[in-house]
């Protein structure tokens, strides 16, 4: 596996943006928040979400640019659940030399880029860009009167999260791709992004 941040994919993004101008529903992804992972099965492209998990996304970019992920295997693959990588020792439970990260299970954000698909009395479900998310209710937002909504990633197929030990504040370098829905992980693991291409790999 060889992940890389995408200065090289800027040309791809520019070409995509040219086609996007004809379609008002097209959304161009910031190349700074794209991660390309080359595997023996094909290319995987992930849109990282620093608005939801700024420290975890910064760590993934740092480790990618440092080459830590180059040549690593997916050391934990469970059909219908996850495919996990990012351990420098190619086994479960390893870490980089950097300190562990704090949990970033939820984020307070404005509703500007949010598209609700389902609204309930206790919250809503929808998308932040390509990422499936859940939120607190608008009534709760008004009660808090902060001008923001509490968001958290919904662990659906293609969502990318940070691996960790039993302690909530133990994410470090490992990350995983959801291969099926596991909503029991919501608000227990930091969501860092969404697979936008190559989910079949």
Model region roles, listed by residue range:
Residues 18-201:
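Cyclophilin-like peptidyl-prolyl cis-trans isomerases
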Residues 7-16:
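Bacterial N-terminal signal peptides
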Residues 1-2:
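N-terminal secretory signal peptides that target proteins for export/translocation
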Residues 6-7, 38:
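Intrinsically disordered, low-complexity Ser/Thr/Pro-rich tracts
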């Amino acid at each position: 596996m060889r992940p890389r941040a995408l200065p090289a994919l800027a040309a791809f993004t520019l070409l995509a943006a040219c086609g996007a101008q004809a379609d008002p529903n097209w959304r161009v992804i910031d190349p700074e928040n794209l991660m390309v992972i080359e595997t023996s099965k094909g290319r995987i492209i992930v849109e990282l979400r620093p608005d939801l998990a700024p420290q975890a996304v910064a760590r993934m970019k740092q480790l990618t640019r440092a080459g830590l992920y180059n040549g690593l295997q997916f050391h934990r693959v469970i059909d219908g659940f996850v495919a996990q990588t990012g351990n420098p020792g190619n086994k479960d439970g390893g870490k980089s030399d950097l300190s562990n990260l704090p949990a970033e299970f939820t984020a307070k954000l404005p509703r500007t880029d949010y598209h609700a698909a389902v609204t309930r009395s206790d919250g809503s479900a929808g998308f932040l860009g390509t990422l499936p998310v859940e939120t607190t209710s608008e009534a709760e937002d008004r009660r808090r009167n902060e001008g923001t909504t509490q968001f958290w990633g919904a662990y659906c197929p293609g969502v990318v999260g940070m691996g960790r030990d039993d302690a909530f504040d133990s994410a470090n370098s490992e990350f995983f791709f959801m291969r099926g829905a596991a909503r029991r992980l919501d608000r227990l693991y930091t969501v860092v992004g969404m697979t936008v291409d190559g989910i079949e790999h």
